[in-house]
Amino acid sequence: MSLGKRWDRWLNGLLQRAARPESLSRVARLPLGGFFARRQARALFDLVSGFTATQTVLACVRLRVFERLLAEAQTARSLAPGLGLTEEGCQLLLDAATALGLLRRRWTGRYGPTPLALAIVGLPGVREMIEHNTLLYDDLRDPVARLQGRPGPALAAFWPYAGDGEEAPEAPAAEAYSALMASSQGMIASEVLSAYDFSSHRRVMDVGGGNGAFLAALADAVPGPRLVLCDLPAVARLAEARFRARPDAQRFAVYPVDFLKTPLPADADLITLVRVLHDQDDERAERLLARVAKALAPGAKLLVAEPLRHTAGAQRFSDVYFSLYLRAMGRGRPRSEGEVRTLLEAAGFRKVRRLPTAVPLQTSVLLAERPA
């Protein structure tokens, strides 16, 4: 038996003895043990009751509680009629939101929002994602089925390209998911634009660019490069409409293509994949990166922006929320930096490096180069 296996067996035996009810009770009665027992109890309760916090936030968002209290601090009695709640129900909601750190009861007896609630009110896309998460909640009623590889019906229907087939989505479906992606694109674009200097590039092509929100933000921030977007026809039409309405419309070009089936336009010296690679399983990711590499001239660069698994401080998002989300969606998976690096190098890219971002929970950025 190897040393590692003996270590695992010894440690498991120790943990098995510690997990006995009498052991846990004995530890809880000790002065220091009691402190750790209480802390563990709180952590365990947070895990098993997390859905109640989610539903409290959803109720506050749907009733616009934070906006109402931002306009005027109120008591449960004064707020309840406007929410369509009884005073008792309103008080329950206010107390729950206060316990979650979203509201604060002032010395006047009225309630007002905390900075955490202001983030829900002010940050683009947060309200939309809270509402959208009801689909994920429905799909995760049976988490074992999702882990077995059976996609959930709600998210698979919302993302029409996520099924086993590769048919293009119809316009209404494309509008729905493009609007959701665009609602949070401002935060992502800000992270990417802060992480990398785009001004040295002549022609930037955003593959899978949706309705053009990222390229529009890039155009506002960097006056130089020509900007190209490639996406499915139903989505590309939305980008064309957005760009036509801009005073600098001549900077943009849109190509309606299925980037897994059709060669990409050449002549870009930078291609961006913003929240695209993680939507593909490994085989599709390899096909996509092969097309990207073929479209780039030697010395041109590829920028990948998406959340990465095992990112320090962001594991609850990348390793829990996002991993289960994509599993429920039925396609793609979040990858670690090493896994993305392996895919890039297998496609022929070199000099792969990670660029620092201010909020890795939102996105990480990897830059790679097509060698000469």
Task: Label the model's feature ranges.
Residues 105, 113, 304, 351-354:
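Short beta-strand "wing" residues that participate in macromolecule-binding interfaces
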Residues 1-22:
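Eukaryotic partner-binding/assembly regions in large regulatory complexes
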Residues 123-313, 351, 361-364:
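Conserved adenosyl
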Residues 303-347, 352:
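C-terminal alpha-helical "lid/dimerization" subdomain adjacent to the S-adenosyl-L-methionine
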Residues 348-372:
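Core SAM-dependent methyltransferase catalytic element
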Residues 22-202:
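Conserved Class I S-adenosyl-L-methionine-dependent methyltransferase catalytic core
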